[in-house]
Amino acid sequence: MSSGRIVQIIGAVIDVEFPRDVVPSVYNALKVQGAETTLEVQQQLGDGVVRTIAMGSTEGLKRGLDVVDTGAAISVPVGKATLGRIMDVLGNPIDEAGPIGEEERRGIHQPAPSFADQAGGNDLLETGIKVIDLVCPFAKGGKVGLFGGAGVGKTVNMMELIRNIAMEHSGYSVFAGVGERTREGNDFYHEMKDSNVLDKVALVYGQMNEPPGNRLRVALTGLTMAEKFRDEGNDVLLFVDNIYRYTLAGTEVSALLGRMPSAVGYQPTLAEEMGVLQERITSTKEGSITSVQAVYVPADDLTDPSPATTFAHLDATVVLSRDIASLGIYPAVDPLDSTSRQLDPNVIGNEHYETARGVQYVLQRYKELKDIIAILGMDELSEADKQLVARARKIQRFLSQPFFVAEVFTGSPGKYVSLKDTIAGFSGILKGDYDHLPEQAFYMVGSIDEAIEKAKKL
């Protein structure tokens, strides 16, 4: 193990000088003597100097301190010992429950599985959330993105998905909290504990208050743990909240390393950094990784380089809309903007496909008629259009659903709706079976039977 010394500190970026014949490799982990700080080599500047990013706070560091090269990349605990524990980017426990006691550690930088090793599949993953199961069904072993601006419900939707899928799904889950609020991490931990699924979840947190190097690598730490479960032949769920913060950490690091920014100030390596992470999240012949990723959309602009780069990697996109949230319809999923590669009659069957497309047609037509209604009023519409508008408003309300994780806010018990009931309900509304019911009966209910019961009380 060679040692060097700190020659320059600029925020989270630290330059370390080593003897020229023992310069550490890129991505090697370095330990600062007398401090708890770990550094990761990013660049070799020549003359034995390497530029590194700190994985923790750089307070108290000064020039001249000794630094030791560990000779390998950052490695983290993997395997069953990580379940039920909260760890940081280096795999250290932060839940005050003693050492992890792992049997194996793995480096966080791993190659993506080769094309020959990858496996595809068309099995659907039922979420119990009507709007998602209907218009943007998830594939087992697929990648899903939850896109939304500030405060439209990405984290609540993700927590509901975790609750529904992890409770119904017997496998393991890994949750990576990348640059999100510590409060949310705390809520999430207690939610898992109360649902009795904590012993099947490994939690990795690198929150907003951490330096950029930490937030940039914490997603890889979580992914490395998920890969181990997959390689053992399990079907794993990987939840990442939030991919945008991963990109933003890369932007901060890139600027500190002195790279020229590209479009909108993002790092020039944006697409490559996203690819390095996303290409590893895949299913192999051994097991599958199904990932759900929350993606913050800056200023509600889906064409921003960060969400736009993420789109390319996903199998299903769930777009949360501020307009729908403002109507009080939660989950605020936009059924016209959200898409899935599984929405194909050969995969989901004709009945599901026709119902989903029928719902989208009615909502799209209602959207077009809104301008006429605003100017001339409902009376100017033809009878057929009046009927369509009435059904569209019922569909819009029936797309809402009370969540288990939001019971404390809404006061109404959560509902899990099977795919069969979802298709039957929407198909009935489209056919006109429920034209006699008031639209309010469809708001915040589970299955169509509950809407019929609610109508009797109105």
From Swiss-Prot:
Question: One GO MF term, please?
Answer: ATP hydrolysis activity
The record's section on PANTHER family has:
ATP SYNTHASE (PTHR15184), ATP SYNTHASE SUBUNIT BETA, MITOCHONDRIAL (PTHR15184:SF71)
Name this protein carries in UniProt: ATP synthase subunit beta
Which reaction does this chain catalyze?
ATP + H2O + 4 H(+)(in) = ADP + phosphate + 5 H(+)(out)
Query: What is stated as this protein's family in its record?
Result: Belongs to the ATPase alpha/beta chains family.
Describe the protein's quaternary organization and the partners it interacts with.
Answer: F-type ATPases have 2 components, CF(1) - the catalytic core - and CF(0) - the membrane proton channel. CF(1) has five subunits: alpha(3), beta(3), gamma(1), delta(1), epsilon(1). CF(0) has three main subunits: a(1), b(2) and c(9-12). The alpha and beta chains form an alternating ring which encloses part of the gamma chain. CF(1) is attached to CF(0) by a central stalk formed by the gamma and epsilon chains, while a peripheral stalk is formed by the delta and b chains.
Among InterPro entries, the record links this protein to: AAA+_ATPase (IPR003593), ATP-synt_VA_C (IPR055190), ATP_synth_F1_bsu (IPR005722), ATPase_a/bsu_AS (IPR020003), ATPase_alpha/beta_chains (IPR050053), ATPase_F1/V1/A1_a/bsu_N (IPR004100), ATPase_F1/V1/A1_a/bsu_N_sf (IPR036121), ATPase_F1/V1/A1_a/bsu_nucl-bd (IPR000194)
Organism equals Pseudomonas putida (strain ATCC 47054 / DSM 6125 / CFBP 8728 / NCIMB 11950 / KT2440)
Record keywords: Glycosyltransferase included?
no
| Domain of life, source organism | Bacteria
What's its EC? 7.1.2.2
Which Gene3D superfamilies does the UniProt entry name for this protein? 2.40.10.170, Bovine Mitochondrial F1-atpase, Atp Synthase Beta Chain, Chain D, domain 3, P-loop containing nucleotide triphosphate hydrolases
Q: Name one GO cellular component term.
A: proton-transporting ATP synthase complex
Question: What does this protein's UniProt record list under function?
Answer: Produces ATP from ADP in the presence of a proton gradient across the membrane. The catalytic sites are hosted primarily by the beta subunits.
Q: Which residues bind ATP?
A: G148, G149, A150, G151, V152, G153, K154, T155
Tell where it localizes.
Answer: Cell inner membrane
Tell me which UniProt keywords the record has, alphabetically: ATP synthesis, ATP-binding, Cell inner membrane, Cell membrane, CF(1), Hydrogen ion transport, Ion transport, Membrane, Nucleotide-binding, Translocase, Transport
Membrane topology per the record? Peripheral membrane protein
Q: What class of enzyme is it?
A: translocase
PROSITE patterns linked: ATPASE_ALPHA_BETA
The gene name reads atpD
